[in-house]
Amino acid sequence: LKLPNFAVIKEVGPRDGLQNEKKIVGTKDKVKWIQLLTEAGLSYVEVSSFVHPKWVPALADASDVFSELKRDPNVTYAALVPNQNGLERAFLQNVDEVNVFLSASESHNKSNINKSIKEALAVIEDITKQATFEGKKVRGYVSTVFGCPYEGDISATAVDEICNQLFSYGIYEVSLGDTIGVANPLQVEQVLEHLLKKYDASQFAMHFHNTYGMALANVVKSLEYGITTFDSSCGGLGGCPYAPGASGNVATDDLVHMLHKLGVQTNIDEEKLLRASQFIQSKLNIQLPSHVYRALQHKTISR
């Protein structure tokens, strides 16, 4: 395998991982969890979402979490921003980076944010302009890239058209999301073959869910194409409220463990990462799906 020497892991657990959990984690516990994640060496954390609390009650305390964080200057603390109101709240908390999102599928876009792709792009263009003016970098998520619960397969051309728009607005990186976890390595190859004719691998991140257990295989295929940035969630938490059947994100614990075994460095301490998983599992009172955590949790707890 010809693989890169280093990969960047963007931790999305505090936002994507917690947004669907029925049990709401308290603000102080979220702050402590984020601190454990950064102490483990994660240099990028998506802290929360400035979405209306009515839609995502689990993240209603986004402003409080940001104001209580003791920020490490070497860490990027990002937030998901759905609209103008969310952007103003994000500015008040001086977030390091603004994340915007839309779906490659019209149906999922309608279901998720009640907008057409065209309408969503107009909102994103406006947010990006304002955020850039304020000196904030903007990152874009495109969801359902590899399949939609309503429309099935999504064409690489449709994804390309959206990416083209996002890059034209000044978005520095697009995270390609397998929202319902249906991607396989062949499909990843097909999408990247298409996109990398036109764009550089450094402009993309991959965001895999593990519904069918193929997330890590998809990561390896992406690495072969020179992709070096991956979104993941501590312990494998997460799903999508508007994507029926979606399971958790690829677990940061599993991803880091595999990368290290493949000789790809991350600057993340696996043992400290397991402590972060152990902490959030105890607060949610659930069994985390991470394979590495399950295999090693007793070893971690016994120390």
Predicted regions and their residues:
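Catalytic cores and adjacent flexible loops of soluble metabolic enzymes
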Residues: L1-R303
